[in-house]
A protein has these predicted regions:
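Short, low-complexity disordered leader/linker segments with a strong preference
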Residues: 1-31, 384-386
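Immediate post-signal peptide segment of exported/extracytoplasmic ligand-binding proteins
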Residues: 19-34, 62-71, 161-167
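Extracytoplasmic "Venus flytrap"
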Residues: 24-54, 76-83, 105-108, 172-181, ...
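Beta-alpha junction/loop-to-helix N-cap segments that form part of ligand/metal-binding clefts
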Residues: 29-31, 44-51, 59, 63-135, ...
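Sec-exported extracytoplasmic/periplasmic mature domains
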Residues: 54, 58-65, 90-98, 114-122, ...
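Extracytoplasmic ligand/sensor domains, especially the bilobed periplasmic-binding protein
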Residues: 83, 97-200, 249-274, 355
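Extracellular/periplasmic periplasmic-binding protein-like sensory domains
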Residues: 238-313, 325, 379-385
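Segments of small-molecule ligand-sensing domains
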Residues: 299-309, 320-377
Length: 386
């Protein structure tokens, strides 16, 4: 009996020791971190992502937390700057001792911060960027939710080409890794139709004049234009086109799927298509659950939610599902084990079902199409996969 008691005591000590060694987890708290842009070029997106995260964290804590533990969310501002992202990651990982990094925004900041996290066995959970590097090459500490720009175009462009009977497909894209991913996806999609891009035009990040690119595409008789653009360049390109009487079909990636396009660009933006998954939460949305959620968000933060608010919300929700499934002894290993058989069902925003596995780190590769109609984004297609 005595030896059994000693063995049990040793087991208890070992178990509590393992728990004590797990950074960011105590008996009544889980500390998570996020790096956002709160003062840089995409600060609007960063603030909205943070808002969605805060809303879901507060709801979970009000309901008693995760297996009895409350969530503590720490937010750092890196202003969309990779150098600042490294410093923010070092602070969160080494000083604040977070358990996990969630919803870090932007491709370059994530690429800069991940080595800091991985050195300390900290998962990079569902960053807010659609870059393939968020799940490739495989790493056990990477989890991604955003369908890559490449796959979005590869799937959606052929559908639209057929629907519009387009003969000449052209592109304007940002002269960097983001723009190239959109362009390469367009090329891959056209290849399935035995077509090629008839005209390729580029612009440097920060450009404000797109007249020469539009003139070139107009002269080339392009009837469908793929936009490797974000906000200002999308509005600038379409605005210039309308002004010159050039009215092709415009298709953007999920980077153009934001209410800022129609809010800032006005009626000229009507007709724009974008690939997307998670639906923009309008306050007067026909869907009652989205409408209720959007008004709850507005009441809490005194501003309208956006699709980025929805991203923040669903990412924290997915984390909570996996952490709950991991059980009372929450460690990086138990979390990964829970994710290995994880199925995240579709949500009120219509996001595609996501599945993860031992070697599967992208939840879903399905996209659908939305179009700006009467000054609002409207979902117009079902999901499609590569």
């Amino acid at each position: 009996m005595r030896s059994l008691a000693i063995a049990l005591a040793a087991t208890t000590v070992a178990a509590s020791g393992a728990l004590a060694q797990q950074q960011g987890v105590t008996k009544d708290e889980i500390v998570i971190g996020t790096i956002q842009d709160l003062s840089g070029p995409i600060a609007a997106f960063g603030k909205q992502t943070r808002g969605g995260m805060v809303l879901r964290v507060d709801e979970i804590n009000e309901q008693g937390g995760i297996n009895g533990r409350k969530i503590k969310l720490l937010v750092e501002d890196a202003a969309y700057d990779p150098k600042r992202a490294v410093l923010a990651a070092q602070k969160l990982v080494n000083q604040d001792k977070i358990f996990m990094m969630l919803a870090h925004i932007g491709t370059a900041p994530n690429l800069a911060a991940m080595p800091v996290q991985f050195e300390k066995n900290i998962v990079n959970f569902m960053p807010v960027t659609a870059a393939r590097e968020m799940y490739e090459p495989f790493h056990r500490l990477k989890y991604s939710f955003a369908v890559p720009y490449y796959d979005q175009m590869r799937v959606m462009l052929p559908r639209l080409v057929k629907e519009k009977s387009a003969k000449k497909v052209c592109t304007i894209y940002q002269d960097d890794e983001f723009g190239l991913e959109v362009m390469r996806g367009a090329e891959a999609g056209l290849k399935t139709l035995n077509m090629e891009l008839a005209e390729k035009t580029t612009y440097k990040r920060g450009a404000t004049d797109f007249s020469s690119q539009v003139a070139r595409m107009k002269a080339g008789n392009c009837d469908l234009v793929v936009l490797g653009t974000i906000i200002r360049e999308t509005i600038g390109t379409i605005g210039e086109s309308r002004k010159t009487g050039f009215n092709p079909t415009f298709l953007g990636s999920s980077a153009t799927y934001t209410d800022l396009i129609h809010k800032l660009g006005g009626p000229a933006m009507n007709g724009l298509y974008a690939s997307m998954g998670t639906q923009h939460p309008y306050l007067d949305e026909a869907s009652q659950p989205i409408r209720f959620w959007a008004n709850k968000y507005k009441t809490k933060f005194n501003e309208d939610p956006t699709v980025f608010s929805a991203y923040g919300y669903v990412i924290v929700d997915a984390f909570a599902r996996a952490a709950t499934k991991a059980g009372a002894t929450l460690t990086t290993d138990s979390f990964i084990k829970a994710m290995d058989t994880m199925v995240i069902p579709t949500d009120m925003f219509g996001s595609a079902e996501a599945t993860y596995g031992p070697k599967k780190r992208l939840g879903s590769d399905s996209s659908r199409l939305s179009q700006i109609q009467d000054g609002k984004w409207k979902v117009i297609s079902d999901y499609a996969t590569p």
